[in-house]
Amino acid sequence: MWWKFRDPWDDSFAKGVTAALEAHGREAHDPWCIGFFVDNEINWGGPSDLAKWILQSPADQPAKAAFADWLAKAYGSFPALGEKWGRPYADRADFMGSVALPGEGAKDDLYKFSCIVIDEYFRRTREAVKAFDPQLLYLGCRLAGHARDEVAAACARHCDVVSYNIYRETIDDWRWPGGIDAPVMIGEFHFGATDRGPFGTGVRQADNQVDRAEKMKGYVRSALANPQIVGVHWHQFSDQATSGRFDGEYLQVGWTDICDTPYPEAVSALRQLAGEIYSTR
């Protein structure tokens, strides 16, 4: 599932982040809590899509006003902008009221402002997290798979630790795009089997519970072998209900079943891994 992108210039954006953090105030002050993920697997669209979506928004969209400010500074007037874009604008109000996409002449501007939007999202989210508790780490937004270079670079600039959800057999050969150097936490990974529990195996399938435990160990060991990875975060602690969660997902991916009974193979694998971590790295 890809979650919709929110307008970082809207007053409700920072308030929403703060409200979400405050709702987890008890966890935030737990000594075992190192930080927070904010958001999950956002839909960033293509290289210029964020700017295009902003142009197609109504006149009262705060991001559209920010785009207008940026363009006015770059071109001096909206008629001059219209000449470049191949879309006549009489003035700022005309620009704000239009939802039509411009011509090929807008290509560079759309890409540049999309990058600005991405940076603003991470900057404002970091501000909200640090205002809530400066000691907590901002763990990013759990990027899905391999994010575009622009997203990865902005994330690395503003996050204490960058989170990626990477569903693979192993990640020892995974590297940052564009040669970026920043600490990475795996936000999600799992393996599922259908010999016990619900009927869904999740993203990565195992033959049975023994095979699942071996695959889990292989993934964690590959993370230990990758110097850019500082942690892995299993998805999820318990199996999902056979009747499905809010979107119908029902996976056998937990360390415990739906009756909170541990899978002994998983527990044994975790215990073995815990004994290896500090001698390995």
Q: What are the functions of these language-model segments?
A:
Residues 1-18, 71, 104-119, 159-168, ...:
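The substrate-binding groove and active-site-proximal loops of carbohydrate-active enzymes
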Residues 112, 116-202, 217-224:
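Glycoside hydrolase catalytic-domain groove-lining segments
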Residues 30-152:
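Polysaccharide-binding and catalytic clefts of secreted carbohydrate-active enzymes
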Residues 1-6, 96-111, 144, 180-219, ...:
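Active-site clefts of carbohydrate-active enzymes
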Residues 46-52, 174-176, 196-197, 244-245:
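Short, solvent-exposed loop/turn and secondary-structure capping segments
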Residues 1-29, 122-132, 156-157, 177-179, ...:
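Aromatic-lined substrate-binding rim segments of carbohydrate-active enzymes
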Residues 53-66, 235-281:
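Aromatic-rich peripheral "rim/lid" segments of glycoside hydrolase catalytic domains that contact
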Residues 31-35, 39-41, 137, 196, ...:
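Substrate-binding cleft of secreted/luminal carbohydrate-active enzymes
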